[in-house]
Amino acid sequence: MPVRRRWYPPSSTAAQPSPDGGDVNTDDADACPSSRQQRPPSLPQHSAPIHHRRRVINSIDASGEVMEYGSSNDQRMQDMEIWPSDGGGVEEYDPWTAWLYKPHTVSVLLAGACLLIWASGVLHPEITSSHDKVIPIKRGVWAMIAVFLAYCTLQAPSTILIRPHPAVWRLVHGMAVVYLVALTFLLFQKRDDARQFMKHLHPGLGVELPERSYGSDCRMYVPENPTNRFINIQETLFDEFVIAHVLGWWGKAVMIRNQLLLWVLSVGFELMELTFRHMLPNFNECWWDSIILDIMICNWFGIWAGMHTVRYFDGKTYEWVGLSRQPSIMGKVKRSLCQFTPAKWDKDQWHPFMEPRRFIQVFCLCVGFMTVELNTFFLKFCLWIPPRNPLVVYRLILWWLIAIPAIREYNTYLQDRSS
């Protein structure tokens, strides 16, 4: 459906539609002052935001409304709308949510200081007094991390992502630094000490895991089993890694948004499993488990679902107007929920075969991706972390959040250098 916008008579310097009905590009950044001056007196001067983007005008109907067509990216509005201010300048955000984008350093400082005083227990020393010296140390370490994350949320460098809020991605940046510091600390510990240290993060850790090999019996049909002759297939299908494969590749497809690159990573990781099966028992899989179940079923379904999600939202037409301009309560609710979705769903163009340098750059991305995935299994094996431990899920979610701005910025960097 086309987007309908009210049309006002253009100024003498504005571009006119061609007589043959062709497309004419007009620049809103240049047409903003003239369009504001020529608004009818019955309409308020500040009733609509000024969007800094280019419009493609196809036709003007009899009612005086512009019919806009074009790609979904041209239709998409950014969250940072340019609103006229009463002082003659411009404001970058919707008036209802502008306070969220203003600095609140002093307010957070005062609130954080009060929270730290309350959490430290200095107001009630008789309650917090304990002979156990480990508990205060744990609370102190968590308080240090909280203070650092609060600082990163306020002062860390912003990414190119604006949804749901730039502060969210600054917080993710701080969590990535905390994770890096924790890995650095474990690097300087002995292996047994590092395993026992994990008990401070989860009480169920620090215990040696039983070795499990998926390739000990690769028969698809087991005739000597009276209860279930397809017991090997059943145990593999109901393993937790099946769901992990599907959800993981769906998330990777939403991040990378390039089918060729996703299939390279899918096949490449299976080759990595084949390479390191002598080191990790979990990598010792049967041929039908690795080729059929992993690549052709789980990975394919995750990639298909992720790319279908990207195509679905990329093909829809949006009008990202501010929250205050939504006409109904449901519209305001939907606009608030859309704030937690990406601002752009267009597919990334990597062009790995454009030139040798671009091929090396994309190859480095694949190597980094597979290294992060291999680290998951090596850390579980070295630190005795079972697959169903919540720390594994927390780490994967953290890495997914870290990879979202990292891949987007890396793709933007490659596109800017090529242009």
Swiss-Prot record:
Stretches that traverse the bilayer: 103-123, 142-162, 168-188, 260-280, 287-307, 359-379, 384-404
Catalytic class of the enzyme: transferase
Database matches in InterPro entries: PSS (IPR004277)
Record's GO cellular component terms: endoplasmic reticulum membrane
A Pfam family matched in the record: PSS
Keyword set includes Transferase: yes
EC number(s) stated in the UniProt entry for this protein: 2.7.8.8
Single GO MF descriptor: CDP-diacylglycerol-serine O-phosphatidyltransferase activity
This protein's pathway: Phospholipid metabolism; phosphatidylethanolamine biosynthesis; phosphatidylethanolamine from CDP-diacylglycerol: step 1/2
Catalytic activity: a CDP-1,2-diacyl-sn-glycerol + L-serine = a 1,2-diacyl-sn-glycero-3-phospho-L-serine + CMP + H(+)
PANTHER family (UniProt xref): CDP-DIACYLGLYCEROL--SERINE O-PHOSPHATIDYLTRANSFERASE 3, PHOSPHATIDYLINOSITOL SYNTHASE
Protein name, as recorded: CDP-diacylglycerol--serine O-phosphatidyltransferase 3
